[in-house]
Amino acid sequence: MLASLIGGIFGTKNERELKRMRKIVEQINALEPTISALSDADLSAKTPEFKQRYNNGESLDKLLPEAFAVCREAAKRVMGMRHYDVQLIGGITLHEGKIAEMRTGEGKTLMGTLACYLNALSGEGVHVITVNDYLAQRDAELNRPLFEFLGLSIGTIYSMQEPAEKAAAYLADITYGTNNEFGFDYLRDNMVFSLAEKKQRGLHYAIIDEVDSILIDEARTPLIISGQSEDSSHLYTAINTIPPKLRPQKEEKVADGGHFWIDEKQRSVEMTEIGYETVEQELIQMGLLAEGESLYSATNLNLVHHVSAAIRAHFLFQRDVHYIIHDGEVVIVDEHTGRTMPGRRWSEGLHQAVEAKEGLAIQPENQTLATTTFQNYFRLYKKLSGMTGTADTEAAEMKEIYGLDVVIIPTHRPMIRNDQNDLIYLNRNGKYNAIIQEIMNIRQQGVAPILIGTATIEASEILSSKLKQAGIHHEVLNAKQHEREADIIAQAGSPNAVTIATNMAGRGTDIILGGNWKAKLAKLENPTPEDEARLKAQWEQDHEDVLQAGGLHIIGSERHESRRIDNQLRGRAGRQGDPGVSRFYLSLEDDLMRIFAGDRVVAMMRAMGLKEDEAIEHKMVSRSIENAQRKVEARNFDIRKNLLKYDDVNNEQRKIIYSQRDEILAENTLQEYVEEMHREVMQAMIANFIPPESIHDQWDVEGLENALRIDLGIELPVQEWLEQDRRLDEEGLVERISDEVIARYRQRRAQMGDESAAMLERHFVLNSLDRHWKDHLAAMDYLRQGIHLRGYAQKNPEQEYKKEAFNLFVNMLGVIKTDVVTDLSRVHIPTPEELAEMEAQQQQQAEAMKLSFEHDDVDGLTGEVTASQEALNDSATEQQTFPVPESRNAPCPCGSGLKYKQCHGKI
């Protein structure tokens, strides 16, 4: 009430922003006559002039009016398109590091060229980030003539790209690519063995297309680069036989003989007591569990991991909804966009469990080598902006997490689309039949094109089957028709066209009423001017016919969890002032209604005695649906915030490690760095045998001499020194031993020569850093899985996580230094040939490393057991079984033949 009163007096924040920006637009428009009078050569010459002025200290803000006027004039000459005033406002919004919400069809791609051009003048590079490779390639090629006319270079990055080509793309003034590729390149750049192998040159300015999809929908799923771990396919195959013998419990707190409880909201499962006993008996019969042994003993947690993954695969993940089978492989379907995600795999053994369920070849599990989240990656940019048709519903989250304001850009022409009330049916069959009947009614009335939005591939195929039975020609656009996507969308506005699309979010192509005559022309082998004239004339007639029929009709077959994605579907109609109609058809069996809408609504509708083909429109039901969506949005926001709290801790550690790595790669010699490591390791080693501030009787001098001999291969007469100098205290001893160890290292270094020594140092430091960072990521993942249990002890899980993570990090740094010092002390002096071979192997390892790129499952926050937990628990248990040797480099007492530090002493 108060907010609306203040807004009525002073105007809303958005109105004030638009008023300020319109003054800048007036300045740009005032320059148009002058800029229009320039020749092509003079117009192109403006770019080097602007760059020089920027280098001389003039700010981009000061250059903006003139630069925007130049970009608009160039677009008019090269592309035949002139930026509208509202697009200029959008360009200013992007330049100022904000989100521009612009309705579908208002020209976001053209709007983005303004901010790209202005910010490219700094010479630090602009990244334009899209949701898929097709859009990145399309937008780059569409804008290439404009930017090249203005003297700017343009590049595109994509997966499996040649390294030299990708490096060149990053060096361009403007680089197009997907959010996944930019994120993975950042991680890959921090796994290289030389600075020359790095591709990204810095994160200066980014414009994110469909910013809500990338920063909101995909923010929940961390980016992971992982490598293959040991093969356990036999376990997946064996345990896959268990879930069909189990049945779910209907209610969480009511025991009804069920074996497990499903939490659909969290996509997790929890076994009941009966479930534990049943699974234990099955495992005993298979010989995977010893008689009388508990499934939850520390040594059997790997079995819990496999059983949990198998149950989730059978009961939570459905074929043609969450994944499809393509060429004998399980391919994930993005629930937000309906696109397949080839090469991506679920983690926590879930992907292998699904492969076992489908009877496919089981690929090995993956171990995390590097990880980050989109939230933290995009916050690394000095300036970030975005554009979308729907962001206002998530404006609070954009501001809280990314510090981005949302500016709603007015439309060039008024919106006249007719958004009709939802119709709610008793079940899905009744809903689908009503949709078919509505399509037939629309077709009887005229030639209006129809777009049907579905939430899953399964729903699209059911509707497709019913349309075939009704004899209605139609196109289907889902993950299975990815290759034909552009063609299908291009003609979805043609007269009488019926198109079924799974999750229209992020499709990125406008639906033009009457169809796309240019797309038809492009399909002809040798088009003539007559062909062009004929197709254009036909389109003009079709366009007019479709307008008279009421424009594009949108039929939503289900409400999405997010109001924003519903709005994206609606937004396909009514572009640039065109007419259009939209309506959603719902049923009580829809997931949103079933899980979130509440039993009261369902009970009320059943009590009304509705028949299958009857629908209701009721304010209470509509409110319940909207409240359900708000609940889901709030829950997802909480999940993202929670993920960010924990990843912020990881992020600080990641930045330290990556910064340290860059310093190591940049240094010609690491001698000073390695010598400092020697001092720190000596101090820690001596403290183990000579406790700080202790008396001589507590000193274990013999143990210290043995450790120096075993770990470093150095014989030092420490006892003799103490006898000769009674005043030698703990501090003096640390200094004397460190000096002696460093002196001997310098002798070995001199024997190797500076060049060979520098290479050997870099090799050992990077290998140790990467190896232990990888193990640290697994330990951090395990820590996060179980940290919620600290809440039962009246402790704050977040604070406990920070404390434990810090201890793990400090411990990791100590182990890295110890490994480097011991390896450098004991390695034999290599020949030049051995050094060359070592370098070649390292390079080969970097290039041949089999990496897979995943989106991690956010359900990890709920505390499920994971592979990393299994490994750590096994390790912890076995450490208690065997005695700890005097040195970490001594053979492991378990008899494996490995060093203790590589076996049961592994941290």
Curated annotation (Swiss-Prot):
Annotated localization: Cell inner membrane; Cytoplasm
Main subcellular location of this protein, as a coarse class: membrane
Disulfide bonds: none
Binding-site list for ATP: Q87, G105, E106, G107, K108, T109, D510
GO molecular function annotation: ATP binding; metal ion binding; protein-exporting ATPase activity
Catalysed reactions listed for this entry: ATP + H2O + cellular proteinSide 1 = ADP + phosphate + cellular proteinSide 2
Any Pfam family the entry gives: SEC-C
Membrane-related topology note: Peripheral membrane protein
Cofactor requirement: Zn(2+)
InterPro entries, per database record: Helicase_ATP-bd, Helicase_C-like, P-loop_NTPase, SEC_C_motif, SecA, SecA_CS, SecA_DEAD, SecA_motor_DEAD
A single BP term in Gene Ontology: intracellular protein transmembrane transport
Catalytic activity, EC: 7.4.2.8
Subunit structure: Monomer and homodimer. Part of the essential Sec protein translocation apparatus which comprises SecA, SecYEG and auxiliary proteins SecDF-YajC and YidC.
Name of the protein: Protein translocase subunit SecA
The organism's taxonomic lineage, starting at the top: Bacteria, Pseudomonadati, Pseudomonadota, Gammaproteobacteria, Moraxellales
Gene name, Swiss-Prot/TrEMBL: secA
